[in-house]
Amino acid sequence: LERNPIFWSCPMSNKWLIDIVDSDFLMHDMFGPARKYGYHLIQTEVTAIDRDKKQVRTAHGSIEYDYLILAGGIRYAYEAWFGNDRVAADYTRKNFPTAYIPNAEHLALKRKIRNFTGGTIVMTLPPPPHRCPPSPYERACIMAWWFKKNKIPAKIVILDPKPNIAPIGMGFRQAFEELYPDIITHVPNAKIREVDPFNKKIKTEAGDFTFNDAILMSPHQASDLVWMADLIGKTPEDKPTGWADIHPTMLHAKADPDVYVIGDSMGAISPLFGHYPKSGHVANAMGRIVAQYIGLRLADKEVKPILPDNLCYMLVNGEPREAIAVKFEYNLRQDGLIEQHQYDIDLRSADLVEEDFVWAKGLYNDFLSA
């Protein structure tokens, strides 16, 4: 069940903003692969999930299931800023789009960058966890490169709720200071207190800011599908965490062993580090892992934990094209906890750009080749 008529790749889409890749590179047909691999693809909108009846209701009718996999990604949590003020939320979404969900926001953001003639662009970063943690910094770099190339008198102010740039902190810091010292300003500990989109003002714990234009990234949460299924976790204070409450290695919901949640909607999986990175690489790995789990269950075989890895490349310079990267590896300790090992590749290089394209094409060929 897929809402969108085509596949649009959020990974690599920052490069599309400055024409390093074209639309054909990001857009892929999904019906051809469905025919090739022998599964049914229905383009529809999910309207409700009834776990007691094992039924998913859609705009085209109801479907019963034995196993359910929820892979809906994220949703924007504008209510963290505006409460129930839908006017402010809708105004922000329309005028200061973030383009972290595949939709028309990407085109709106590209137009915003191309039409900008000068002034200050503020970019708010969501608090962790959020989709693709290093990508806002990459976006700032490629925007800065575009403005520098076209001699546009622009300033980019990154309001970061974290105390430090992460991940790939040194690599991004060097890019900011060496390539774009007069364009990019990174403000740490800038947790949002108040957003006034109508008057273009933001209050943070690091000070107050005004802007000519902005990319206002609200906090992220699990997709609507997880909320429909009533599988959102709770804090010790009994407040919603915003993310699915799942078994850390088996990946099914703690409340329902026949419902799996994969990709960016997943909640924390280890007290040692919290969440898996919400990346396309991890999401793809989780799809493969859960497919194996269900196959083993159907065959009445033992299901043993399988852990993913993660790999992200980030473009920081458009000419010459240079990237940095980060790798994550995971292992299961004897006490049953998942352990994370992070390796930042801070030295920007053209080789990493080539590796990025090899990675992306490999992933597309893995599940989108017809």
Tell where the protein language model's regions lie, with residue ranges.
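Residues at the starts of beta-strands that form the adenosine-phosphate
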Residues: 120, 153-157, 258
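Beta1-alpha1 glycine-rich phosphate/pyrophosphate-binding loop at the start
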Residues: 1-40, 127-168
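A conserved FAD-binding loop/helix module that cradles the flavin
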Residues: 262-308, 314-315
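FAD-binding core/adjacent interface of flavoenzyme oxidoreductases
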Residues: 41-138, 145-149
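Flavin (FAD/FMN) cofactor-binding core of flavoprotein oxidoreductases
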Residues: 164, 305-324
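FAD-site-proximal beta/loop scaffold in flavoenzymes
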Residues: 86-115, 210-213, 217-283
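A Rossmann-like FAD-binding core segment of flavoenzymes
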Residues: 36-49, 55-56, 63, 145-242, ...
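C-terminal auxiliary extensions adjacent to catalytic cores
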Residues: 323-370
